């Protein structure tokens, strides 16, 4: 709903827990206005999170997201991002797909995606919502994005091939 209401030329998103510093916003805006990026994502290169509970799963998730999407970001989960308004007006984000906005943008034809190292701070407010359920749902969402980007406009390439294989197996047995 927020993207639909956005009116400025550049749209900024960030988490409410203040682990990302608002002072980073001008740097993101600069990359969009002066370097012509469609979207710039923050990269929490030095993190202040639990190694086993968050850092390692995040590294695994980011590696899988890079491999399946072709988007070369180090930190898909960073909530601090800047977008040209035209980008957010041309993508559909639902459920927990917010972490895949760069992939959705790429699939919508916005391929100039940048990344900027941002300061990550210890959590000041609230508690993390990250857990095993969110980790699993993140990978299921990744599979959904991969499927939609690969077969969304030609689903018969997958279903037709699977149906043909099943038909042949049934015919031959």
Functional labels for PLM-detected ranges:
Residues 113-116:
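Conserved alpha/beta core of the MobA/IspD/sugar-nucleotide pyrophosphorylase nucleotidyltransferase superfamily
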């Amino acid at each position: 709903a927020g993207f639909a209401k956005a009116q400025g030329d550049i749209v900024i998103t960030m988490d409410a827990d203040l682990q990302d510093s608002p002072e980073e916003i001008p740097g993101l805006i600069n990359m969009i206005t002066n370097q012509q990026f469609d979207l710039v994502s923050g990269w929490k290169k030095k993190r202040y999170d639990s190694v086993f509970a968050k850092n390692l799963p995040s590294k695994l998730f980011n590696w899988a997201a890079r491999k399946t999407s072709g988007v070369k970001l180090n930190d898909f989960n960073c909530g601090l991002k800047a977008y040209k308004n035209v980008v957010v007006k041309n993508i559909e984000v639902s459920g927990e797909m917010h972490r895949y906005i760069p992939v959705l943008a790429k699939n919508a034809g916005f391929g100039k995606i940048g990344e900027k190292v941002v300061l990550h701070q210890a959590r000041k407010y609230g508690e993390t919502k990250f857990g095993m359920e969110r980790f699993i749902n993140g990978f299921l969402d990744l599979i959904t994005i991969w499927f939609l980007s690969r077969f969304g406009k030609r689903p018969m390439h997958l279903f037709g091939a699977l149906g043909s294989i099943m038909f042949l197996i049934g015919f031959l047995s």
